[in-house]
Structures are given as structure tokens and as C-alpha cells.
Amino acid sequence: MIKNLPQIVLLNIVGLALFLSWYIPVNHGFWLPIDADIFYFFNQKLVESKAFLWLVALTNNRAFDGCSLLAMGMLMLSFWLKENAPGRRRIVIIGLVMLLTAVVLNQLGQALIPVKRASPTLTFTDINRVSELLSVPTKDASRDSFPGDHGMMLLIFSAFMWRYFGKVAGLIALIIFVVFAFPRVMIGAHWFTDIIVGSMTVILIGLPWVLLTPLSDRLITFFDKSLPGKNKHFQNK
């Protein structure tokens, strides 16, 4: 019997209900006005403020994606520096299991969710596009934006940090999620619901089976025993 089965099932039900609330209604029901209002709010700001235009352009440049990796790495490094050799090895392996989980859940989400939709910049007409307002390399459109893979990866990182490093680390990771995921919404490369519905659906249905069961701990133990360079065994928390 899985110890946290009631919580896992509850989270799965919430995730499924969230997705169906968006998927079943014609034109996505109450979600579409929310999506449209958020898109047009930020889209109008692009021509009202040059500073905002540049902010959105720069935060959707590929280099900014590298900054998100740096932020995640620095947070994990802050814990790594405090550990001895076995503890440091453990943190590296947690990162490996986190990456493996992110890849698997992202692929499953893309394959199993029966949705393909273009970003709002490719859906609405008579709108402002950063790529047309500035000659700066930036991502302002996507032919298939659902679910939001970038947001999904950052949410998985947040959950792992919470699970293995505590609430404070989890909250800092959530701040990183907001800072690096929502510029995609501001520029129009993603709908708000790509993240709030799409990414969250995959997280609520898939991730509990990794973090609320012994699976993640067993994977960490497996890699600790299998990978070279091991000096001491460690115990999972």
C-alpha cells in the first residue's frame, strides 16, 4: 500500500478536473476570456512603453533561458557547498533524477494530451509582435504552445527543491518559476493557460507518483550505487 495514495489520487483528480474545465467547454469556456484579457493587456503595453518592450524582448531571448539554468544551478549550489563529499554526490544525483523526471513527464505530456494550438500571436490578428517592433532575436510565437514545457520544467524543479531541500528552497524555486516562465506569456509566445492549465495538469497528475512515492528515493539510491566515483553510502531523507 502506497503511504501517500490518498494525497496522490486527490492531486490527480484536481489535475484532471483542471484540464477538463479547459478542454471540454466550447472555445475553452471561461478560460478564453482570461487568456485574451491577459494577452491584450501585455500586448498593448508593447507600444505604450519602450522600456517594457525591451524588457519583454530581452527576457524572451535565448540567453535569458541560460539565466534560468544559472538561477536553478546557483540555488542547488548553495546547498552543495555546505555538504561533505557524500552529501555533494547526493545533490548531484538529485539533480540527475530531477532532469530525468522532467524529460519523461514533458514527453508524456506532449504525447498524451490531445491538444495542439498556436500561441496567441499566431491566433489573433492586428496585434503587436516584438519581432516586428525590434530587431532583437526573441521568441514571440509558437505553433504548438500547449502545454508550456518551459513552465513545466521550472515547476518540476520547484517541487524537487521543496521535497529534498525544504520549504524555503521550494519558495525560492517558485520565484524563479514566475520570473522565468511568465515572460513567455507577456510576449505572447504562450497563453496563460499553457502554464496554469497545461503545465499544471502534467505536474498534478505525473509528479506525485515520483515525489510522493518511494520512486524518487529509489532512483537516487540506484544512481548512487551505479555511477562511478562513490566513496560512501548515504541515506535518503
From Swiss-Prot:
Pathway in which the depicted protein is active: Bacterial outer membrane biogenesis; lipopolysaccharide biosynthesis
Protein origin, superkingdom: Bacteria
Topological domain ranges for the Periplasmic compartment: 27-62, 112-145, 189-194
Gene3D superfamilies, alphabetized: Phosphatidic acid phosphatase type 2/haloperoxidase
Catalytic activity: di-trans,octa-cis-undecaprenyl diphosphate + alpha-Kdo-(2->4)-alpha-Kdo-(2->6)-lipid A (E. coli) = (Kdo)2-lipid A 1-diphosphate + di-trans,octa-cis-undecaprenyl phosphate
Phosphoprotein listed as a keyword: no
Keywords for this protein: Cell inner membrane, Cell membrane, Lipopolysaccharide biosynthesis, Membrane, Transferase, Transmembrane, Transmembrane helix
TM region(s), chain numbering: 6-26, 63-83, 91-111, 168-188, 195-215
Outcome, altering residue 190 to A: Lack of activity
Protein's GO biological process: Gram-negative-bacterium-type cell outer membrane assembly; lipid A biosynthetic process; lipopolysaccharide biosynthetic process; response to bile acid
EC number annotated for this UniProt entry: 2.7.4.29
Cytoplasmic-side positions: 1-5, 84-90, 167, 216-237
Homology family: Belongs to the LpxT phosphotransferase family.
Miscellaneous comment in the UniProt entry for this protein: In E.coli, lipid A contains typically a monophosphate unit at positions 1 and 4' (bis-phosphorylated lipid A). However, one-third of the lipid A contains an unsubstituted diphosphate unit at position 1 (lipid A 1-diphosphate).
Function as written in the Swiss-Prot or TrEMBL entry: Involved in the modification of the lipid A domain of lipopolysaccharides (LPS). Transfers a phosphate group from undecaprenyl pyrophosphate (C55-PP) to lipid A to form lipid A 1-diphosphate. Contributes to the recycling of undecaprenyl phosphate (C55-P). In vitro, has low undecaprenyl-diphosphate phosphatase activity.
Protein name in UniProt: Lipid A 1-diphosphate synthase
Classification of source organism: Bacteria, Pseudomonadati, Pseudomonadota, Gammaproteobacteria, Enterobacterales
